[in-house]
Curated annotation (Swiss-Prot):
The chain crosses the membrane at residues 2-22, 68-88, 100-120, 147-167, 171-191, 217-237, 254-273, 294-314. It catalyses: a ubiquinone + NADH + 5 H(+)(in) = a ubiquinol + NAD(+) + 4 H(+)(out). GO terms for cellular component: mitochondrial inner membrane. The keyword NADP does not apply. This is NADH-ubiquinone oxidoreductase chain 1. Belongs to the complex I subunit 1 family. Its EC number is 7.1.1.2. Keywords: Electron transport, Membrane, Mitochondrion, Mitochondrion inner membrane, NAD, Respiratory chain, Translocase, Transmembrane, Transmembrane helix, Transport, Ubiquinone. Pfam families: NADHdh. The gene is MT-ND1.
Length: 318
């Protein structure tokens, strides 16, 4: 039964990822005053299926000098971790209601760094290695602020379980009392998922394609799926943390619809940002984090820690 539940979670995620690629190409197309994919199927609806068939029927080539075990393991690890992070997400009922669901998600996103590092190192190519080092430095840096912002929101909800956040936000979304945190969280998720304007890892002009430059066919498709699954997952987490939908226990499907709509809107904003903004320079990327976000998030975290202590001495107002 658990395996069936697991499948009913994984299959929709993979389907969503497949059609997100189509939505992205369509939106970017219309923003650049062109059509986007419109040949395969009605309005290009079968394009993701054609892409999948093309990628998985290609011969998975590998460089002669690569470390074969790591080279094959890296994309598998990337996709496995991307799908594992969906387990504690409440929609409104999670697959596993973990006491420390937030910590689990942080740990899984930290492990994703290994997939990037392995793929760059095992390819035995200087472009892949430089791309991987960039990706790892960026991911590790932005995880610092993500962790602090998560801690601040948890101080407001009072539990490490994600399901508690639904109850916390019955009366007010957490985006309202903590909008600076939300802004920084959203920008950090862009950087964490290597999306424009922070897509330094795949700087085509200097690194060809980044850490996955030597991958082709199936393994490349796995990296691609992992990247887009992470994007949807990060937006789903943003919805859970800051835009919590109201959950009526008798009609859980209303929560799911609400949750999906908000996640979709956030994902659209990712694509909108990609079409609108140019890429950051690498030093600007690091300055933004270490000199702007980190001091601000630390100050706000201290504020959320001290606030209940300061208020504790005030007698109840009737």
């Amino acid at each position: 039964m658990f395996m069936l539940n697991l499948l009913t979670m994984i299959v929709p995620v993979l389907l969503a990822v497949a059609f997100l690629t189509l939505v992205e190409r369509k939106i970017l197309g219309y923003m650049q005053l062109r059509k986007g994919p419109n040949v395969v199927g009605p309005h290009g609806l079968l394009q993701p299926i054609a892409d999948a068939v093309k990628l998985f029927t290609k011969e998975p080539l590998r460089p002669l000098t690569s470390s074969i075990t790591m080279f094959i393991m890296a994309p598998i690890l990337a996709l496995t971790l991307a799908l594992t992070m969906w387990i504690p997400l409440p929609m409104p009922h999670p697959l596993l209601n973990m006491n420390l669901g937030v910590l689990f998600m942080l740990a899984m996103s930290s492990l994703a760094v290994y997939a990037l590092l392995w793929s760059g190192w095992a390819s035995n190519s200087k472009y892949a290695l430089i791309g991987a080092l960039r990706a790892v430095a960026q991911t590790i840096s932005y995880e610092v602020t993500l962790a602090i912002i998560l801690l601040s929101t948890l101080l407001m909800s009072g539990s490490y379980s994600l399901s508690t956040l639904i109850i916390t936000q019955e009366y007010i979304w957490l985006i309202l009392p903590s909008w600076p945190l939300t802004m920084m969280w959203f920008i950090s998720t862009l950087a964490e998922t290597n999306r424009a304007p922070f897509d330094l890892t795949e700087g085509e002009s200097e690194l060809v394609s980044g850490f996955n430059v030597e991958y082709a066919g199936g393994p490349f498709a796995l990296f691609f799926l992992a990247e887009y699954a992470n994007i949807i997952m990060m937006n789903a987490l943003t919805t859970t943390l800051f835009l919590g939908a109201w959950n009526n226990p008798t009609t859980p499907e209303l929560y799911t619809t609400n949750f999906a709509m908000k996640t979709l809107l956030l994902t659209m904003s990712f694509l909108w940002i990609r079409a609108s903004y140019p890429r950051f320079r690498y030093d600007q990327l690091m300055h933004l984090l270490w000199k702007n976000f980190l001091p601000l998030t630390l100050a706000l975290c201290m504020w959320y820690v001290t606030m209940p202590i300061m208020m504790a001495g005030i007698p109840p107002q009737t």
